[in-house]
Amino acid sequence: PLGYPVGLMDLFTPVSSGKININTASLMVLQMVPFIDENRAAQIITLRSGYDGQEGTDDDTPAGSQGMNVLAFLASAGLSQQEAAVAARYFDQRSRTFEVTVEAEVNSYKRTFIAIVGRNSPRDVPVLSFYWR
């Protein structure tokens, strides 16, 4: 049997806006987009990591910062203008679907609540799914 570095769970989500957040997508997820191979995906990650090369630090330069829109970001990663225009249709600059976990305790009774929410705007955050453990 063939071995794969990732599974479907690492690449797809059943609840989303239908676009990939270019600022948080993994190397493997980026490669699902037309014209983005492993080298270009690695370049996208390098670009968004900022000067220190570490993601999640103060010097990160995500798409959308300092006037760098998705098209310009993709062009900086080595895509032609035509390739960038096609690939850009699959990307967004922010995440819109989140999992929220809350642990509650009332009179020594504990329960964990989990919700999937969609962030349409700061004031429009519908609950898409809700359950408890």
Pin down the residues of each PLM region.
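Compositionally biased linear targeting/interaction segments
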Residues: 1-133
